[in-house]
């Protein structure tokens, strides 16, 4: 039975689940949630990457607010996780879902008692004083990496200095991939 009060921790932090696909969710965490003392990210969920459930986003990448890292749990347990962790907000961190899929997830989250939010670029974009070329696609596997390598090669070929960045992906050792 709901009391109508927030289920925040004793420190009055807003408890958050980041709903994602093991990519943008890590990026959103690193750029917005990681250092913000108002929020406590209690878990990531995953649905698109095989065998990622049960892993932990490493403490070494989480910062001081998360000395034990953050667990990655199966998205199909979302409602259970909202109740288990007494979650206040679920933040959508997918980039490749249809409107129907997004709103279905929002309805599930709201029915379980949590707020649903989608982060905009204002809070998650990495700032740069240099010109930027962004390589984006609608789905995983569309060729972003190959396209990025080709663009990098062209720019280097005309004498430009190039730096390529991407959000963390859960393939291999995330700590070793840190820059």
Q: Positions of the model-derived regions?
A:
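A solvent-exposed beta-alpha-beta segment
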Residues: 12-87
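Conserved beta-strand elements of the Class I
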Residues: 15-19, 134, 163-165
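Short, solvent-exposed amphipathic alpha-helical segments in soluble enzyme
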Residues: 29-36, 106-108, 151, 179
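Short, charged/polar "capping" segments at the starts of alpha-helices
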Residues: 49-55, 97-101, 172-174
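Phosphate-bearing ligand-interacting subdomains
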Residues: 58-122
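Phosphate-binding P-loop
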Residues: 124-130
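Glycine-rich phosphate-binding P-loop
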Residues: 134-151
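ATP-dependent carboxylate-amine ligase catalytic core
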Residues: 154-179
């Amino acid at each position: 039975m709901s009391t109508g009060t927030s289920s925040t921790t004793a420190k009055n932090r807003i408890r958050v689940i980041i709903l994602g696909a093991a990519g943008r969710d890590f990026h959103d965490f690193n750029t917005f949630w990681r250092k913000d003392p108002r929020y406590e990210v209690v878990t990531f969920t995953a649905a698109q990457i095989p065998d990622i459930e049960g892993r932990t986003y490493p403490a070494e990448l989480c910062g001081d607010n998360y000395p034990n890292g953050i667990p990655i749990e199966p998205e199909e347990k979302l409602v259970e996780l909202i109740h288990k962790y007494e979650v206040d907000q679920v933040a959508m961190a997918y980039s490749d879902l249809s409107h129907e899929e997004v709103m279905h997830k929002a309805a599930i989250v709201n029915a379980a008692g949590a707020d649903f939010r989608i982060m905009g670029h204002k809070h998650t974009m990495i700032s740069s004083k240099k010109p930027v070329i962004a390589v984006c696609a609608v789905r995983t596997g569309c060729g972003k990496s190959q396209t990025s390598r080709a663009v990098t090669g062209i720019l280097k070929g005309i004498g430009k200095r190039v730096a390529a960045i991407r959000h963390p992906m859960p393939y291999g050792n995330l700590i070793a991939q840190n820059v």
